[in-house]
Amino acid sequence: MGNVAGETRANVIPLHTNRSRVAARRRAGQRAESRQHPSLLSDPNDRASAEQIAAVVREIDEHRRAAGATTSSTEATPNDLAQLVAAVAGFLRQRLTGDYSVDEFGFDPHFNSAIVRPLLRFFFKSWFRVEVSGVENIPRDGAALVVANHAGVLPFDGLMLSVAVHDEHPAHRDLRLLAADMVFDLPVIGEAARKAGHTMACTTDAHRLLASGELTAVFPEGYKGLGKRFEDRYRLQRFGRGGFVSAALRTKAPIVPCSIIGSEEIYPMLTDVKLLARLFGLPYFPITPLFPLAGPVGLVPLPSKWRIAFGEPICTADYASTDADDPMVTFELTDQVRETIQQTLYRLLAGRRNIFFG
């Protein structure tokens, strides 16, 4: 067909030629590469780059394995706080389920090991830094009577003695303290003392404990030792009438003398206000450098350095059963125990350089 006069021919431009497709793909590839990590842009045929990447991967794996090992070792050895939390959780579970036992004196071993003893260990290890010697003189089993000096206004010495026996003795024995009646009349404290295994300081209870094969402790000085002035420190007071000796003789329990230094300095008593003591119904009302002037701060014991020494046991098996009622025998044995403790105190004091650092 011929062209019409005056008509202009239109040129058709192809939009999708192979060349344009290749150029578009190239531009898209460049944009994709610009969004990739630089480590992926290296030439895959470049051997050095591949080796470098492999080295980095190996290093990352090594760090990961090391971190995993550290985490495992950390989890295998929980810190003290984690142990305490776990102990409290276990304690609550057993208390709620009733999975614990109490003896005739009210001793609750579960309560003692989970609550009382962990609290006392802070004072034993960190505050008073107690050093123990002669613990091998305490029998591994069976009855025995530990006789110790008494001092310090508040009976921290008995509490530290119980921790020392349990933690330092190979058999980890529980020590049953014979305490003053007033302790068990106090709210909360009296009940806690019962649960910790302690009972009143009377011949009847002492005999029952020893007859049951329990390791028992007594402080024959009583309030006379606990409430003496600082100027009389480490001078033993009278040991009562020897009731503890009679109990040991009746049950054939060995007597283990025990000497404690450091307890006299925790509350240095300057004087005893007897009028206030009678007013409050107390055996004594102490005035120390910090109490009562410093208020509650004065109740914090000074961090003196403690030493507890157990002497060789005095055998009672060779005594006759009638000797327990013989005043001369009980007096002689009481005096022997007292003198042993006193001489050991002098020896320990002679080796001490400083009250607070030992």
From Swiss-Prot:
The organism's place on the tree of life at top rank: Bacteria
GO cellular component: membrane; plasma membrane
InterPro entries: P_lipid/glycerol_AcTrfase_prd (IPR016676), Plipid/glycerol_acylTrfase (IPR002123)
Protein name as it appears in the record: Uncharacterized protein Rv0502
Coiled coil region boundaries: none
Family to which this protein belongs: To M.leprae ML2427.
Ranges annotated as biased composition (Basic residues): 18-29
Stored PANTHER family: MONOACYLGLYCEROL_DIACYLGLYCEROL O-ACYLTRANSFERASE, TRANSMEMBRANE PROTEIN 68
